[in-house]
């Protein structure tokens, strides 16, 4: 935090995974912030605010320490199953950050990886639903 202050940082951001244990068709970004103004900004960006429980580990600690040092702090997490590397979760977080910070980022490669995973998941799902066959006992 001392370095952030020295460099004139105003807002400290942490990112992480919001693990649900299931594959979401349309994953969401969840977040929390140290100030009500930031909470409202996140809501305007389509972020679902975490309003119960606690943000744990460094994702909660760092924004909390930022507030103690009179810096703004926020946490963003991308919804993911937790079963695999999930470029979709990274991509949806980046989209929020791009809007919030007014950045331009080439996400072509990340989008390609996300599409590959979506295709693989769809093929797996199609295979599972297509293999129901007969469930008669053969014993």
Roles of regions detected by a PLM:
Residues 15-16:
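Short His-Asn-centered micro-motif
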Residues 1-7, 21-139:
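Accessory terminal and edge-of-domain segments that mediate assembly/interaction
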Residues 10-11:
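Structural motif
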């Amino acid at each position: 935090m001392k370095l952030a202050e020295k460099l004139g940082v105003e807002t400290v951001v942490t990112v992480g995974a919001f693990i649900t244990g299931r594959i979401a068709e349309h994953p969401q970004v969840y977040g929390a912030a140290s100030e009500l103004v930031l909470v409202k900004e996140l809501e305007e960006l389509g972020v679902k605010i975490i309003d119960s429980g606690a943000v744990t580990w460094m994702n909660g600690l760092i924004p909390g320490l930022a507030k103690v040092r009179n810096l703004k702090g926020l946490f963003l997490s991308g919804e993911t199953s937790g079963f695999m590397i999930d470029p979709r979760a990274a991509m949806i977080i980046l989209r929020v950050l791009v809007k919030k910070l007014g950045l331009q980022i080439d996400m072509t490669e990340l989008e390609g990886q996300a599409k590959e995973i979506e295709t693989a998941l769809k093929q797996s799902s199609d295979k599972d639903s297509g293999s129901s066959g007969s469930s008669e006992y053969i014993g």
